[in-house]
Amino acid sequence: MDGFLDLYLQFNIPSPIEEATWRHWFEIWLKELGVQEPCELSLCLTSDEHIRQLNREFRHLDEPTDVLAFAAQEMLAPFGIQDITGVRLLGDIVISVPTARAQAKAQGHRLSQELAWLASHGLLHLLGWDHPDELSLQRMLQQQRQLLAAIQLDGEVAHGQQP
């Protein structure tokens, strides 16, 4: 799928996952989700302090969280801005590595598995998925499990809840 995905990676904290692996996972996930057009997204791995600032600024919650997703369409649509390059701008995913590490420990699996779970959750948000109620949440969690199965991590991340 060369040229299909422009993935921008920013690691404010070292990633236990190689850049090529991140790219491979996102390409598989986008294919699994039926995305056919070229697209662009960014992934930032960061600290609790940084994600807390973002959470406070954009969600008015003064606390760290595990993952934030900023969908480009939500940000650009009010201004009538459209991409004229033919590349679908998905947006940005930000993951707190310290929070992911704590969640991985609590769930009894590796950090890399938790990061994949959180990245898949963020990607679904960029593609318009949301979980305003329990049924929507369960559907989204099931889709995440399918995405992890597509990269052979299905049995290793057994989340039942996602905040």
From Swiss-Prot:
GO terms for biological process: rRNA processing. Keywords: Cytoplasm, Endonuclease, Hydrolase, Metal-binding, Nuclease, Ribosome biogenesis, rRNA processing, Zinc. Zn(2+) binds at residues 121, 125, 131. GO terms for molecular function: metalloendopeptidase activity; RNA endonuclease activity; zinc ion binding. InterPro entries: MetalPrtase_cat_dom_sf_prd, YbeY, YbeY_CS. It holds the Pfam family YbeY. Coiled coil: none annotated. Its EC number is 3.1.-.-. It comes from the Bacteria. PROSITE patterns: UPF0054. This is Endoribonuclease YbeY.
